[in-house]
């Protein structure tokens, strides 16, 4: 993690030494699930709610102050939740170009993911950005369920909803489909152009995989709607949402 600099590296080392559960989220998770994003060096972690205060205390001991909106503009869906604790990795003051690098911690309860759904990262797979050795990750079914439940909790025009739906469609697309070419079936099946046999077979395999996911009993609807999306019966906009306009 040499790209982080001494301060952020020390902070993550202290969190590891304090047995803080760090679960990758946002960019690094999407990359691990196959979505070929270009990381800018930011790190995002889910933390058990009961440990988030400890994260802030350790950060303060090391001289870190939370970055507020006037210093660090919220860009990623998890930041727009209003629950993220954010720290600047760099001391740069530019406000143009790529988003400034950030170290972000978020309560796990926002995603609905529980500690028994996460798994350790067992090998150094060379993915970037590099993470602490003790970091955990989220398997595809649990990640997709989290994206869907977050989207369902938000109002239809919410930036958070739009962001997590994009993440949901992207990780499924790159995990379950051959994205080396542009298929027309990713969300809406065309009315005037039949699918090729290869595309039909790919959809069948993806649907079979989604149906095999072990989700919570009260969240079987997530599998049902994803199957409907990839068989052309629905679109991602049909995911449930909260009622009322977004302020």
Give the residues covered by each predicted segment:
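Charged/polar, solvent-exposed surface patches and flexible loops
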Residues: 13, 57, 61, 224, ...
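Generic structural motif recognizing short loop/turn segments at the entrances and edges of beta-strands
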Residues: 18-21, 41-43, 62, 83-85, ...
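Active-site nucleotide-donor binding segment shared across nucleotidyl transfer reactions
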Residues: 4-57, 235, 240, 246-247
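Metal-dependent nucleotidyltransferase catalytic core
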Residues: 2-8, 47-89
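Surface-exposed beta-strand edges and their flanking turn/coil or helix-capping segments
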Residues: 37, 60-61, 118-120
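Catalytic cores of NTP-dependent nucleotidyl/adenyl transfer enzymes across multiple folds
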Residues: 82-247
């Amino acid at each position: 993690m040499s790209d982080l600099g001494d301060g952020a590296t020390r902070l993550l080392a202290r969190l590891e030494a304090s047995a803080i559960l760090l679960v990758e989220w946002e960019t690094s998770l999407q990359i691990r699930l196959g979505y070929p994003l270009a990381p800018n060096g930011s790190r995002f972690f889910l933390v058990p709610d009961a440990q988030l205060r400890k994260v802030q205390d350790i950060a303060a001991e090391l001289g870190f102050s939370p970055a507020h909106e006037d210093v660090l503009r919220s860009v990623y869906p998890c930041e727009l939740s209003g629950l993220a604790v954010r720290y600047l990795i760099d001391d740069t003051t530019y406000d143009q170009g790529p988003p400034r690098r950030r170290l972000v911690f978020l309560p796990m309860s926002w995603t609905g993911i529980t500690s028994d759904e996460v798994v350790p990262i067992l090998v150094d797979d060379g993915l970037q950005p590099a993470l602490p050795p003790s970091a955990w990750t989220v398997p595809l079914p649990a990640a997709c369920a989290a994206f869907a439940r977050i989207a369902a909790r938000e109002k239809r025009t919410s930036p958070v909803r739009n962001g997590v739906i994009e993440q949901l469609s992207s990780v499924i697309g790159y995990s379950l489909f051959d994205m080396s070419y542009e298929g027309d079936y990713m969300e809406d099946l065309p009315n005037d152009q039949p699918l090729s046999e290869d595309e039909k077979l790919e959809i069948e395999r993806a649907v079979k995989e989604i149906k095999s996911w072990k989700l919570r009993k009260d969240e079987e609807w997530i599998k049902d709607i994803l199957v409907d999306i990839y068989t052309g019966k629905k679109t991602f906009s049909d995911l449930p949402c909260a009622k009322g306009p977004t302020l």
